[in-house]
Amino acid sequence: VMGHHNEDYDCFGAAMGVACMARALGKTVHIVLSEMNEGIDRIVDMVQKDEAYENLFVRPGDLAGVASQSAVLVVVDAHIPHILADPTLLERIPKIVVIDHHRRSENFVKNPLLVYIETASSSASELVTELLMYFGENVRPTRLDATALYSGIVVDTKNFNVGAGVRTFDAAAYLRRSGADPVLVRALFQSDYETTVALARAKANAEFFPGGLIVGSIPERLANGQIIAAQAADGMLRVDGVRMSIYVFQMAGDMVGISARSTGEMNVQVIMEAFGGGGHANVAGAQVKDAPLATVRAEVIERARAYIEESDQSESHTAG
């Protein structure tokens, strides 16, 4: 089981849910985690300390010898090959299942055996939770499974405030009955002093552009830079007059991440697709390889401003 590299809580929760189903079927299962997953270190450490999950996690390259016709690769919370934790597995495992809640991109996993994409769903964790609910009475998530899935839903819905529907609350109720611990989830999301300062700094260096666009950057590589960028982008939407907020942040190596948010008036997914990413109309992101952060930031500003101008002109013509 694997998701996108630099996994977030939704990706991790969905992977844990799929692993739960695999164990219930008596199958050997592994979750591939990328080297860049500092944002979920706390919950990963908790799972690793539990003997019931021994040898569950592997790193990219650990399954280099796997090329079995009987193996099944389940991809969660992503479907674009180059952003996956270990894209080489796509070439060695013929049976591939995709479970995602993002709009289908042109760059898609080749020849999947099964595709389950539901863009109306709040999160991949919600989709996997629904599968668990109808999988059979013999499948019951553990407390850690349920908490991981619950945390994924909480993150992607911003505490059930964005994109949460009836099915979301049904899934959350099932997870609570299965032992999901909201207190533990809250503890997982607590920020230390350094993160709080970094978030304040990220907000302070943001730049406002005509049309309701804010663009900020985090040039230094931080252990939880992705989380800080997402929180900063979310926070800037509360500024009066802002319709779109985008943050560019440095990742490991020559990788640059982009976190985009909108109030709903603008479709940030369209902009992120231009950078090889995706998401939803009001929440999207991308990761760019081999490009300086300043270059990516400049291109983000150019594309976002052009999109806003075109969108406003189109709306003006329609109103006329």
Q: Which residue ranges define each predicted feature?
A:
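Hydrophobic helix-and-loop "lid/oligomerization" segment in the mid-to-C-terminal part
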Residues: 1-7, 11-56, 60-71, 150, ...
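Short acidic, glycine/serine/threonine-rich loops at helix termini
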Residues: 12-14, 42-45, 86-88, 108-111, ...
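Glycine-rich, phosphate-binding/catalytic loops in enzymes
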Residues: 18-19, 90-93, 114-115, 171
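Active-site cofactor/cluster-binding pocket
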Residues: 57-111
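A generic local secondary-structure boundary/capping motif
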Residues: 61-64, 84-88, 115-118, 138-140, ...
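Short hydrophobic "helix-edge" motifs at membrane interfaces and signal-peptide entry regions
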Residues: 90-91, 145-147, 266-268
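Conserved beta-strand scaffold positions in the cores of enzyme catalytic domains, especially
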Residues: 96-98, 114-116, 213-215, 247
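Short alpha-helices
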Residues: 101-172
